[in-house]
């Protein structure tokens, strides 16, 4: 809502009348609201208050540039139903309405020419040609075989190239290859022989490597692997010839193979122009064979003589036929064929309209010189062939060709080949007019000229078609131009009528500005403004949005103190929104042009003071807030009024507020708008048009990823002798054959005998296989070795023990006896009685031998009684040496006399 300058009721009634008549010119007014109503009457909408400050920032002076730039606005913004308050325009910003302008008639015309068009695009597809790959595949395998299965300990693979002489004499000459290879590694020449047999000539046979673009031939499909005992090394030499496709992209400085290898040499290399062709190889690695005949190893047929290039890499040799760049490569490719094309001439360009394809290409009027195109020799050839085919099929009997093929370079990098066509009737007029001008008779048989040269340039001077002065032709041309002019004039009249209507509307606006300038300027700007007339110009100021919660409506429209007078519009109290600072608030009201404008400064101060003090006003039309309460009238009986407040209406009866009425309860009349139903364009179905297909985009580049991966997968399978590997079953096949023989010859008995033989053989083979597998296991061999070492050590210890027992049996069997004897000898030395000690020792030994003999007999009896209680002689001897007694509970006899006897213990007095 805005606060606008006050006007008399009569003037406002006239303004409303004009607004209703010219509602389209007065699309909006100062105020908008999105408010509700409740109680008496503090109306507010918290949802709308959030945007109050944002809208308030637009308040200020309006320059003339803003008025011009706001000519195109969004009309939906006028009816947002928000409340605005506007400062009184003081003349700081003035605008004027434009004057009616002169309307020009549309007289532009175009020249259209029909014909056949062929469009070309850049050729992004690589150059594809056939190449042959020669190499020898060397495989060296080292195996180890012990008592079990054989093991591969090392496998070395490499490829070496094949010399030109061998290729010419053997491969392409005889269709065979020698299984010997000589190669240089680190300045050392090595030789390899297949199966370690000196070079043998073998025929080249097809391999598993087969694809639509690749074929391969080799001499062997078995990789040699020896399985004799110990370490063995075997060598395989396979001679391989592969036919594949090579690819190269512009500018054709290198090419790639299906193997993934690239060669840094131009595919158009020739020795005659080798300095102008890219080549990274030394001279001895590139050889040009003149009149070379290559052999197809599949059909065994020699090709016609052709110059052929050979490049010798370390791992392979590549050969391909020499090609002419101008006839083989082309930088352009045909895109579209347009049998019905129209060339429309404009001031600076040609528009080539392809209706069937729903496409138009724009090109310069200057024809393109096709000779400027590098490697563009294919363009005229393809264009002539295509246009000739279309003309012979569709236009041969109805049209003739006018001139030759013209080339135009269109925007976007498209090359257009255009052939102009003229109908036979129009061509006759051309020829008749040319004949009259040259005073020569031309018979009607000239109509057959298109079948020969296909052109109407058959006049004596050769330029007859360029003079178009025939009256008959002019009539025909006028008919065509009339139709074209009628269509163009129809559009021109609409434009002229629109211009005249705008001029007349300007006149109405000049009158409306005298009645209600604020409504007029609001409609023009597209947002709420305040305006007043200053002579022949308008003073304009922007408006401040008032939040709905800052507006308080009063429920009575009677003037206090005078019961006979009432307010014409509802009265209210409002407050300006709080500003961020005083300067920002001053910018929201009409600012004076200079500091000497005291009135403007006072107004800014008043506006700043009104931020915090309520301002008395009245609710104006279209959510306007009028400063003051001066709109009064004598009170009338049966008073009933609806006033727009925000988006809804307030109902007053007898100058008292009754209720709030929703806008949906009041019927809206929209018949003030007159719809114009005009079909501007005909229905058009667009045709999908792609410059490059998916296959073309996928095929871009020197290497084809799918082809390289497929080749590598097939290559890995080519030498793995899958089809020739022998599967051994450890002799079961032979035994099975014997069983079948017995069954077939002896019948049922033979079958039983065969089953017995097969069962026994299977058991034997399983046992032998188990033992062989156990011996072949490295852990089993390690365990056997450890067991042998332990047995040897145990044998040495046993041998030493036996030798010791033989030398000193008593000391070996009874080591404790020696200690007792030594102690006894010490006592005997003290007593000086060695003889007695020796005698006693001998008695003890004899007694021990007797006890040992008895114990041996007892042990034998117990072994017979309980076979499970077994013990070795060593265990018995150990127990005897540790305990000096038997391990049985029944035998409680002492082995020897204990040391408690007085013979072995003496008093101190004996020492």
UniProtKB/Swiss-Prot annotation:
GO terms for cellular component: host cell endosome membrane; host cell Golgi membrane; host cell plasma membrane; membrane; viral envelope; virion membrane. Residues 1-30 form the signal peptide. It is a single-pass type I membrane protein. It holds the Pfam family Glycoprot_B_PH2. Residues 800-911 are intravirion. The keyword Isomerase does not apply. Residues 143-149, 228-233 are annotated as: Involved in fusion and/or binding to host membrane. InterPro entries: Glycoprot_B_PH1, Glycoprot_B_PH2, Glycoprot_B_PH2_sf, Glycoprotein_B_ecto_C, Herpes_Glycoprot_B. It is found in: Virion membrane; Host cell membrane; Host endosome membrane; Host Golgi apparatus membrane. One of its GO terms (biological process) is virion attachment to host cell. Residues 31-778 are virion surface. Belongs to the herpesviridae glycoprotein B family. This is Envelope glycoprotein B.
């Amino acid at each position: 809502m805005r606060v606008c300058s006050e006007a008399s009721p009569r003037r406002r009634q006239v303004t409303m009348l004009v607004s209703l008549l010219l509602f389209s010119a007065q699309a909006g007014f100062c105020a908008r609201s999105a408010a509700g109503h409740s109680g008496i009457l503090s109306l507010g909408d918290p949802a709308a208050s959030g945007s109050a400050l944002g809208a308030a920032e637009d308040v200020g002076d309006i320059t003339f540039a803003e008025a011009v730039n706001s000519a195109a606005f969004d009309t939906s913004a006028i009816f947002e139903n928000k409340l605005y308050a506007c400062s009184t325009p003081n003349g700081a910003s003035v605008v004027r309405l434009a004057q009616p302008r002169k309307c020009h008639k549309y007289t532009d015309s175009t020249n259209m020419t029909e014909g056949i068009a062929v469009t070309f695009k850049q050729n992004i597809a690589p150059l594809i040609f056939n190449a042959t790959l020669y190499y020898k595949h060397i495989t060296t395998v080292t195996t180890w075989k012990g008592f079990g299965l054989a093991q591969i300990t090392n496998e070395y693979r490499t490829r070496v190239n094949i010399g030109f002489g061998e290729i010419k004499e053997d491969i392409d000459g005889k269709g065979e290859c020698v299984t010997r290879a000589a190669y240089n590694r680190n300045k050392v020449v090595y030789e390899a022989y297949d199966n370690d047999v000196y070079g043998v000539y073998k025929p080249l046979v097809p391999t598993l490597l087969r694809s639509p673009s690749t074929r391969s031939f080799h001499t062997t499909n078995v990789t040699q692997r020896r399985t004799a005992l110990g370490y063995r090394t075997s060598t395989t030499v396979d001679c391989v010839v592969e036919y594949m496709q090579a690819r190269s992209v512009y500018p054709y400085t290198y090419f790639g193979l299906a193997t993934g290898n690239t060669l840094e040499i131009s595919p158009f290399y020739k020795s005659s122009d080798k300095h102008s062709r890219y080549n990274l190889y030394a001279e001895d690695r590139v050889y040009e064979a003149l009149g070379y005949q290559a052999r197809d190893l599949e059909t065994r047929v020699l090709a016609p003589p052709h110059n052929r290039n050979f490049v010798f890499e370390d791992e392979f040799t590549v050969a391909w036929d020499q090609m002419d760049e101008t006839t083989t490569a082309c930088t352009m490719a045909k895109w579209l064929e347009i049998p019905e094309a129209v060339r429309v001439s404009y001031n600076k360009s040609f528009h080539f309209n392809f209706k069937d394809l729903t496409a138009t290409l724009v090109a310069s009027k200057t024809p393109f010189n096709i000779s400027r195109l590098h490697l563009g020799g294919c363009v005229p050839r393809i264009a002539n062939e295509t246009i000739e085919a279309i003309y012979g099929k569709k236009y041969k009997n109805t049209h003739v060709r006018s001139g030759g093929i013209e080339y135009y370079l269109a925007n976007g990098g498209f090359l257009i080949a255009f052939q102009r066509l003229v109908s036979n009737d129009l061509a006759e007029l051309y020829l008749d007019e040319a004949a009259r001008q040259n005073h020569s008779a031309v018979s009607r048989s000239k109509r057959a000229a298109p079948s020969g040269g296909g052109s109407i340039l058959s006049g004596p001077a050769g330029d007859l078609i360029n003079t178009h002065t025939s009256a008959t032709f002019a009539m025909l041309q006028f008919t065509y131009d009339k139709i074209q002019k009628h269509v163009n004039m129809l559009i021109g009249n609409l434009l002229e009528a629109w211009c005249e209507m705008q001029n007349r509307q300007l006149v109405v606006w000049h009158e409306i500005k005298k009645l209600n300038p604020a409504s007029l300027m609001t409609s023009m700007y597209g947002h709420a403004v305040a305006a007043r007339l200053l002579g022949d110009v308008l003073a304009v100021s922007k408006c401040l949005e008032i939040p709905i919660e800052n507006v308080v409506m009063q429920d009575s429209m009677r003037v206090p103190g005078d019961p006979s007078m009432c307010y014409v519009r509802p009265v209210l109290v409002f407050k300006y929104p709080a500003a961020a600072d005083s300067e920002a608030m001053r910018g929201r009201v009409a600012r004076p042009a200079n500091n000497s404008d005291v009135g403007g400064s006072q107004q800014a101060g008043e506006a700043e003071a009104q931020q915090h003090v309520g301002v008395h006003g009245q609710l104006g039309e279209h959510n306007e807030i009028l400063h003051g309460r001066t709109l009064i009238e004598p009170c009338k009986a049966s008073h009933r009024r609806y006033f727009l407040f925000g988006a809804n209406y307030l109902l007053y009866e007898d100058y008292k507020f009754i209720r709030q009425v929703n806008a949906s309860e009041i019927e809206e009349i929209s018949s003030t708008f007159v719809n114009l139903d005009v079909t501007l364009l005909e229905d058009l179905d667009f045709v999908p048009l792609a410059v490059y297909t998916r296959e073309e985009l996928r095929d871009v580049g020197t290497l084809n990823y799918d082809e390289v991966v497929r080749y590598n997968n097939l290559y890995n399978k080519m030498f793995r002798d899958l089809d020739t590997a022998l599967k051994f079953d450890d002799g079961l096949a032979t035994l099975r054959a014997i069983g079948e023989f017995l069954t077939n010859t002896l019948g049922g008995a033979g079958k039983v005998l065969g089953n017995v033989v097969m069962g026994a053989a299977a058991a034997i083979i399983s046992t032998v296989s188990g033992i062989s597998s156990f011996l072949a296991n490295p852990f089993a061999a390690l365990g056997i070795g450890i067991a042998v070492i332990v047995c040897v050590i145990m044998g040495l210890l046993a041998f030493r023990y036996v030798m010791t027992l033989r030398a000193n049996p008593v000391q070996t069997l009874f080591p404790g006896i020696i200690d007792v004897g030594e102690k006894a000898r010490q006592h005997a030395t003290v007593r000086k009685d060695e003889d007695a000690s020796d005698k006693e020792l001998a008695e003890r030994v004899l007694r021990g031998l007797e006890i040992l003999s008895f114990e041996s007999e007892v042990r034998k009896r117990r072994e017979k009684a309980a076979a499970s209680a077994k013990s070795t002689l060593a265990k018995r001897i150990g127990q005897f040496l540790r305990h000096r007694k038997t391990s049985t509970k029944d035998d409680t006899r002492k082995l020897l006399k204990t040391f408690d006897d007085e013979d072995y213990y003496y008093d101190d007095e004996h020492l």
